[in-house]
Amino acid sequence: MTEDELQAALERTTPERDRYDLFVEEAQDQDVRVRFSLTPGESWSTAALLTIVDTALRAAAGVEATVTHLAATRLRDAQPADVIALSRVIRRAGDTVHAECWLFSHAVVEAVLHATATLRS
């Protein structure tokens, strides 16, 4: 799937309030890089970061996939800047997908959160 195709699929399957102006920067095989932006004056809440994790995991595993198990470690506060999500599929077994996601604050390029998940496609 190309970046443009993935962008369209995510926009179709992600509620508008959860998109955070998402932009697919790179989509290669099972690795995906997506940028998320805040509305000026807002800050990233943990709930917003987990929403981004869900979207980024689906970007790698398949936009119709649903998270069945999630383990997340919040490493530090996110800066009031764009967040970059790097997600990748670790293993596929039938309709089960194991994936991980890293979130980075774009302003200082530091990891903000790491998550591992199991999804059903």
How should these model regions be labeled?
Residues 18-24, 68-74, 85-86:
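Short structured motifs
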Residues 15-19, 65, 94-96:
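Short solvent-exposed loop/turn micro-motifs enriched in small/polar/acidic residues
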Residues 1, 62, 69, 76-80, ...:
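HotDog/MaoC-like acyl-thioester-processing domains
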Residues 36-46:
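A short interface-forming secondary-structure element
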Residues 44-67:
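Active-site helix/loop of acyl-thioester processing domains in fatty-acid/polyketide metabolism
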Residues 1-37:
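Non-catalytic linker/capping segments at the edges of enzyme domains
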Residues 30-32, 78-83:
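A short, glycine/Asx- and small/polar-enriched loop/turn
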